[in-house]
């Protein structure tokens, strides 16, 4: 199976040398162009465009970036609940055609209630997952029905709904999702194509893949799996560990980070899982390094792989061996790291995956 490499683009330059998140305020078209082109030239297959209740609108960001690039696809984060699902179905289909099929969608329900409140949604999280499942069902009905249809559900009802535009990709662009709660897994097993998880130890990842495959099989589905990691690479292993410790020092030296975040801890189930591994040990499986996850309260993609490019690529291929077919990778110096990953890491991952596929086929 071909391996998919995903990056993440932001719209403004980072505010420090060691950046945890790329979603910041403002909007710089020049920086967005440079960032997207760097991913395009580096060999990334997709670039995630994140979502927050205060950031630039993701689909417009992705459409602009698509106009500045040649082949890069875009994984656009989208929160159900703020747009009618039939309208969103047409929006996704339109985007897919205008970009020549360079779209995937990451379904997010909102990490915190405060984030949802900022856009006027006061629904509890369990309800948001049920709403998202119904939303996805209605979107897929809009894509698949050639005649007007009716739908009555808990959250949405339509009469005579139809769409004159359907996605270029068949049956539709890939739908990603993440989360570790029962609601997230129930939604994703039935309606999504790729389960996105944070970088956990190999044994835990193997268990999660097996469990979710079983859950999706009940609906006749064979999902893909994405693991999110922060590679920290250097010419020698010692230099890579020195670099990792410098990044940690920069992170923990920031006002508002470190002990406060570690004390409060993550609020979502996926973050709680990540924090449990970070508290268990600094290093798992030789290269999976967790102190940044611990120091920042496991806020998002904070598990790292540390080593030379060859060592980190080999570590990632161990996840590929388990059935992970895509990786979201980004560094702490977002633009420069994307360039370095394209030069040193991505070719090794892709060639290693092809070699592994060849060995499997020969058996």
Provide a role label for each language-model segment:
Residues 46-65, 199-204, 329-342:
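Glycine-rich, proline-tolerant flexible connector loops at the mouths of alpha/beta enzymes
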Residues 81-97:
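Glycine-rich anion/phosphate-binding loops
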